Every structure is written in structure tokens, then in C-alpha cells.
Amino acid sequence: MGTLTVNQNKLQKRLRRQAGEAVADFNMIEEGDKVMVCLSGGKDSYTMLDVLLHLQKVAPIKFEIVAVNMDQKQPGFPEHVLPAYLKELGIEYHIVEKDTYSVVKELIPEGKTTCSLCSRLRRGTLYTFADEIGATKMALGHHRDDIVETFFLNMFYNGSLKAMPPKLLADDGRNVVIRPLAYCSEKDIQAYSDLKQFPIIPCNLCGSQENLQRQVVKEMLQEWERKTPGRTESIFRGLQNVIPSQLADRNLFDFTSLRIDDSATPRFVNVVNL
């Protein structure tokens, strides 16, 4: 890639700054960490790796980066693409081979959504591998739009106010998941991916499933964004500014103990005696 234009330079700086802020705000990476960067071959994970490699150079702490891709034995998967790219970068990498494709195709009826099972199988394999190589953090490429979409998916279909946290301790207690792109927009990531011309690998298993619930939510948010630019960012800020007393979860706030405070000073003016 040659010299960047002014706008391209701003884009790169913005992504690096936002990722750096997310890493700092949630203490995602610490001195001596071994960060396993999970690469799918998509725009998000390529951008995450690119940004983390820059952060590794400029951060005041020392940490390792190990790139890991999982070959799920999907038909037509271009096995050579990621190794060639990572060799050119000169970083440590591993290709984990696990035939989850056959498992998914066997268990999920034709035409049904495969994403949930595929994701669980992939995540479990990666958790195990992170433990094997002694990785202290596992970096995933989810961005701000993913987090907001997940929030609405859980609210609409599961009846829960839950999203994707920027940092998460896995249920097994042995893996800490981080999402360095949590503050970054998908629009910026797509533009950066186009700029860098990353060798994108499409998902042949689920990439064509347009009837996904997530796709419906994504289109809803995109329509909102067209009508009111900045709405997705505002919703994300809301996830960082939760006020339990203004919700209805009795586990988060003790509503039963609310009583009138007779010693409190009245806030209202007695207009009758004015």
C-alpha cells in the first residue's frame, strides 16, 4: 500500500485510537500477555490483527501475538491464503484443523441456520487450543455494530438485556476473551479492509443465509442509521451508561425497600402561598 490520502490516514488513526482506548478502558492486554488473535479470514479479524500489531509496537508494555485460524474443513476452503499472508507478516501462527463442517451439516437440517452451532463448536475448539499454547487472552474481531446487534437480538428473541462484553471470562474460568474493536464501527472496518486489500475468505457454510435473525436486526439498525446518523453509536453509549433504578430487574436494584424519606427537603414550590 502506497502513501495514504488525508482521509485514509484519518481512518487508520481513528481505528488505532479507538482500539487503543478500548484496550485501555477494559484493561484487555497486560504486561507479558500472550494474545491469541483468532483469524477467520474476514475483514474484522484482519483489521484486528493489523491494529494489534501496531499497538504492540507503540504500547508501553510488552506482549506476544499469536495468530490462529481454524480450518473447519468446509468445501473449497482456500488453505493457502492465511498461511501465505501470515508468513509475509512474519508472525507466529497456527492453523487448527477440526472438521466441524461435517458435524454441523449432520445435525442441522438443510435450510436452517447453522451459525449458532458452528460458533459454539469453533469457540470450544479455540478455547482448548488457547489453553494448550498458554495464551492468556483470546482476541475476537467483534466490533461496535456486532455488540449493538447482539443487544437487540437478545432483547427481541430472548427477553434479556445482554450484549457482547468487550472483555469476558469464559465459563471454564481458563480463558479471557477480549474484543479490541469494541469501539470501532463496521463501516470504518470495511473501508479499512478495502484500503488494505486483505485476502478475504468467504464463509461457504453460512455466508449465504440471508434469513438469519441477525441480518434482520442489522438491516433495522442500518435503516435507523440512514434516517438518524449516529444512532448506533448512541445506543452503544447507552450500554455503557446503565441505570438499574430506571429498569425493572429486581436483582439489580432493591425496589422493595423504597420508602418516602420524611426528612427530605421538598422539591416543589408551594404556588398557593406565592
Swiss-Prot record:
Cofactor: Mg(2+); [4Fe-4S] cluster
Principal location: cytoplasm
Name of protein: tRNA-cytidine(32) 2-sulfurtransferase
Pathway annotation from the record: tRNA modification
EC number(s) per entry: 2.8.1.-
Quaternary context: Homodimer.
Gene that produces this protein: ttcA
Chain location of the short sequence motif PP-loop motif per the record: 40-45
Cross-referenced InterPro entries: Rossmann-like_a/b/a_fold (IPR014729), TilS/TtcA_N (IPR011063), tRNA_Cyd_32_2_STrfase (IPR012089), tRNA_thiolation_TtcA_Ctu1 (IPR035107)
Lineage top rank: taxon: Bacteria
Provenance organism: Pseudomonas fluorescens (strain ATCC BAA-477 / NRRL B-23932 / Pf-5)
PANTHER family, alphabetized: AMINOTRAN_5 DOMAIN-CONTAINING PROTEIN, SULFURTRANSFERASE-RELATED
Details of cofactor binding: Binds 1 [4Fe-4S] cluster per subunit. The cluster is chelated by three Cys residues, the fourth Fe has a free coordination site that may bind a sulfur atom transferred from the persulfide of IscS.
Biological function: Catalyzes the ATP-dependent 2-thiolation of cytidine in position 32 of tRNA, to form 2-thiocytidine (s(2)C32). The sulfur atoms are provided by the cysteine/cysteine desulfurase (IscS) system.
This protein's record includes keyword RNA-binding: yes
Organism placement in taxonomy: Bacteria, Pseudomonadati, Pseudomonadota, Gammaproteobacteria, Pseudomonadales
EC top class, as a word: transferase
GO biological process, one term: tRNA thio-modification
Location relative to the cell: Cytoplasm
